[in-house]
């Protein structure tokens, strides 16, 4: 980039190139658009705003003629950010409650339960007990903050089916899982996570610019393109030339150095190594690519995390009985072996946290 920033009244060449690149990597159809922000939370805010505008177009969502406001469904244990809209779709009570009341008409549905999702859609109707139509479902294919929990592929397909039947949008939050992290450019492209379904909106951030603030969303196809009108959404620094150039350079590096493939191969090596380590503290490992969690025999994740850190390995106590492992995409075969060697030595008799 020759300029770090120009007014957002103008499009810039790096911004346009990046939008085209992301649409191509996502396999989004003609008419798709990219809306930039500076973080994952901002990407999810944009997606939720777009879903609210879409909800106003649905039958039964016009209060002026007896309708009821459209709803957005989110999943229990999901995490989408800490800004007000994203927080309203985030499950964790400890971070929600201090800021209540939050954005209305966002409801939580039990993750992984297709009957609960069906019942949430079925609540739509007129009369005293009926609710407004569902505008969108927002979910993570792998619930990262919940302990790296992949949703079942059959469940994801059922959610897509219910969205189609009820004319609702499917928003997939790829802030943690996107840009090669799970062994594909986007997690929704993995058959073992989605069965090949296509989302209506994908959000992204984190790895897209190699540490530079960048995030946003991709809306698939043209049906949503007219909903954001001039002034209805924007951000001073969103998609700035420097951020876009950083993202383009990052995507080039990931592609040229085959880091998506490396994530898949090293992730498989890591999971196999953990289960072959013989450590009785480890009961199982779950995840895709280089986003994984070790399930522990008892609730000692903070003690295990501290032990690993003292011995040269950074892991995250993502749940009381789970350690999250998310090494960089450039991690080598030798480094994975070294990590497994340290993990294998974590004492199995650590005290509960």
List each model region and its residues.
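Conserved N-terminal phosphate-binding loop of PLP-dependent enzymes in the Aspartate aminotransferase
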Residues: 1-353
């Amino acid at each position: 980039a020759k300029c770090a920033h120009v007014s957002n009244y103008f499009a810039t060449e790096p911004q346009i190139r990046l939008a085209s690149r992301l649409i191509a990597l996502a396999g989004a159809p003609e008419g798709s658009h990219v809306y930039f922000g500076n973080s994952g939370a901002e990407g999810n805010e944009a997606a939720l705003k777009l879903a609210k505008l879409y909800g106003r177009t649905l039958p039964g969502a016009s209060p002026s003629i007896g309708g009821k406001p459209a709803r957005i469904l989110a999943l229990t244990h999901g995490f989408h950010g800490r800004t007000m809209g994203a927080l309203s779709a985030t499950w964790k009570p400890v971070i929600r409650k201090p800021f209540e009341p939050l954005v209305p008409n966002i409801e939580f549905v039990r993750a992984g339960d297709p009957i609960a999702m069906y019942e949430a859609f079925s609540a739509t109707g007129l009369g005293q007990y009926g609710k407004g139509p569902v505008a969108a479902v927002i979910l993570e294919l792998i619930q990262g903050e919940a302990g790296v929990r992949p949703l079942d592929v059959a469940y994801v397909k059922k959610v897509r089916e219910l969205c189609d039947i009820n004319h609702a949008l499917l928003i997939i939050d790829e802030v943690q899982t996107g840009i090669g992290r799970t062994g594909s450019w986007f997690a929704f492209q993995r058959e073992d996570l989605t069965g090949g379904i296509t989302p209506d909106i994908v959000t992204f951030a984190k790895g897209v610019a190699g540490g530079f603030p960048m995030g946003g969303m991709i809306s698939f196809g043209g049906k949503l393109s007219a909903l954001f009108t001039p002034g209805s959404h924007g951000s001073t620094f969103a998609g700035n030339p420097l951020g876009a150039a950083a993202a383009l350079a990052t995507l080039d590096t990931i592609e040229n150095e085959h880091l998506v493939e490396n994530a898949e191969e090293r992730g498989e090596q890591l999971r196999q190594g953990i289960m072959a380590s013989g450590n009785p503290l480890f009961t199982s490992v779950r995840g895709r690519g280089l986003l994984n969690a070790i399930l522990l025999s008892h609730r000692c994740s903070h003690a295990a995390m501290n032990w690993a850190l003292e011995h040269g390995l950074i892991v995250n106590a993502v749940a009381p009985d789970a350690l999250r492992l998310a090494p960089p995409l450039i991690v080598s075969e030798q480094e994975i072996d070294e990590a497994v060697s340290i993990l294998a030595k974590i004492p199995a008799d650590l005290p509960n946290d």
